[in-house]
Each structure stands twice: as structure tokens, then as C-alpha cells.
């Protein structure tokens, strides 16, 4: 009979995916306030900062040349062009955090999530849906950040983005923010209680109790 050994800690990778305006960023900020142990992966982007955003907090804001340098140097785990701007996830921070046993949270688009899955097959995708396209349009307009033609372009793209929801393990319908946040917290908690996660985080205890490794 094989038993669990003292394996190196390995954290979970959570990916929050959504079309623009579904409430992804607000949910991620609220989740981090609720659970500071989560490590937010700070993506690089060539888009301009939105009101209230700070470089190095929500995103690392870079120009096209710097983004190209990072991409060409293979320093990005994934990258994609979304609504005319480039987004990418630095590789080192995720590797270091998961090796140290920390859970990592990525706020990402479906293209990036697909690439992350190639590197981390056990990554958990959480797709956030709006309650309706009409509500999505209302939220985009209420943000007051985009011109009408930009909003129209985002709405046009939303259908294609939503079509990739089946690629995620979980789906949250963000109709009531407090309910959606509770559901997001529950997903994180449930993932941490999986046998595979508990076996790594509590390897010594499992070994002492004689719990066999999962096959």
C-alpha cells in the first residue's frame, strides 16, 4: 500500500473569467478583502488605467514596446489581445506562489484561461455571467468609462466570450453582488477541501494517520 509522503506544498490556481461589465473586477476585489491569503496575479496590460486604478495593484500598466519585450523573452505565462489592448500574465509570480503553497487568483479572459490550463491542468475556472445582455449593457453604460462605440464593441464581443463558459468548472450568475460573492467564496473553500489539496497541505498528518495516496 502506498502512503502520502512529505511532498512540497502546492497551491491552487483560480481563474475568474467574464465578459467586460459582468462584475469580475468588483468580485475579485471583494474576495481579496475577504480572504487576504489569496495571492492576486498582477497582469500586464497596454490599456490605459481606469479611474481609481493604481499601477501594480490592479494591473501593471506598460506600453506596447515593454509588453512585446516581456512576450518575446518568454516571461509571460499567457497573453492575448482583448478589445484592442494586450494583456499578459507574468510567469514567475505564479510559479513562486504555488510552490510556496499559496493559492493564486487570476482575473483573466477566456483566451488566457485556456493557455493557463495548458501550464496548470488543475487550475480552476470560474466564469461570471451577467443576468442578461440588457443588464450587461446597463452596467457598461453606468461605469461611465467607455464611449458608445466602445460599449457597442464590448457587447458584440460578449456573446463570443460567453460561449466559452463551458470551459470553466464553475459558473456564477452575478445578479445580486452579495450572493455572487458568497458563491465565489464557497467555490474557493470547497476547492481547498478537496482530497488532493488537503493531502498536500496536511501531508505529515495524512502520513501519520496512514491515509493512502489517491490514484
Swiss-Prot record:
It holds the Pfam family Guanylate_kin. Keywords: ATP-binding, Cytoplasm, Kinase, Nucleotide-binding, Transferase. GO terms for molecular function: ATP binding; guanylate kinase activity. PROSITE patterns: GUANYLATE_KINASE_1 (PS00856), GUANYLATE_KINASE_2 (PS50052). It catalyses: GMP + ATP = GDP + ADP. Coiled coil: none annotated. SMART domains: GuKc. ATP binds at residues 18-25. Its EC number is 2.7.4.8. The keyword Kinase applies. The keyword Transferase applies. InterPro entries: GK/Ca_channel_bsu, Guanylate_kin-like_dom, Guanylate_kinase, Guanylate_kinase_CS, P-loop_NTPase. Its main location: cytoplasm. Residues 11-189 form the Guanylate kinase-like domain. It is found in: Cytoplasm. Essential for recycling GMP and indirectly, cGMP. NCBIfam families: guanyl_kin (TIGR03263). Belongs to the guanylate kinase family. PANTHER family: GUANYLATE KINASE (PTHR23117:SF13), GUANYLATE KINASE-RELATED (PTHR23117). This is Guanylate kinase. It comes from Bordetella pertussis (strain Tohama I / ATCC BAA-589 / NCTC 13251).
